[in-house]
Every structure is written in structure tokens, then in C-alpha cells.
A protein has these predicted regions:
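Short recognition helix of helix-turn-helix/winged-helix DNA-binding domains
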Residues: 1-61
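Winged helix-turn-helix DNA-binding recognition segment
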Residues: 43-106
Length: 109
């Protein structure tokens, strides 16, 4: 990876959104990075359901490839995110991929 110094005129490369609330969240780094990746996916390529809520379709195999992790590691991270209230997964059935709703942490007062 080539690097350069940051200056007032240098534009930043593409980056992932990372809510500050995740900094202290009791979950693995993999879960946090996966959340940031899914949030980016929802913001840029999300689909809208009948209620106007944005969801993504992001197969586990693709998540594993994107993060260079095993499918089992991704499944554990997804469980952490679900247990932490940061995602909701809806099964579609009939061999269709799950819908993943990426939930936004509320700001601290």
C-alpha cells in the first residue's frame, strides 16, 4: 500500500462509515468491521421494502470473501450484531437470500 501525507487539498480515499457508539461496544473487531461494511452497503446499494425500510442482500459467502474471514467467523459476527441489536435478518424462504436490516445506534445524550 502506498501512502501520502494528509494535507488540506488531499481528498480522502473511499472509506467505511463507523458510528462512534461501536467503539466501546462489547463485540469483536470482525463484527464491528462487518457492521461498517453492511452500513456502507445499505447506504449505497440498499433496497427498500414495502414499509420504506432499507435492507441489503449480502450472502455470507460474499461477506467472508470481502473481509477475508471464514464463513464460521462471519456467522459468529452476525450473531454478535444480532444479539447487540444492530441488525435484523429476515428469512425469505424458497432458496432466496435473507434480507438484512442494518439498524442505526441512537446517539448518546
Amino acid at each position: 500500500m502506498n501512502t501520502v501525507y494528509m494535507t488540506n487539498t488531499r481528498t480522502l480515499p473511499p472509506s467505511l462509515p463507523f458510528p462512534e457508539a461501536l467503539m466501546d461496544a462489547p463485540m469483536s473487531i470482525t463484527a464491528k468491521v462487518l457492521y461498517a461494511r453492511m452500513l456502507d452497503e445499505a447506504m449505497n446499494r440498499g433496497r427498500t421494502d414495502d414499509a420504506g425500510k432499507i435492507f441489503i442482500v449480502f450472502p455470507i459467502r460474499e461477506m467472508a470473501f470481502t473481509l477475508s474471514r471464514s464463513s464460521m467467523t462471519i456467522k459468529r459476527a452476525l450473531r454478535e450484531l444480532k444479539d447487540g441489536g444492530l441488525i435484523r435478518r429476515d428469512r425469505q424462504g424458497a432458496g432466496k437470500p435473507n434480507r438484512i436490516y442494518v439498524l442505526i445506534p441512537e446517539e448518546r445524550p
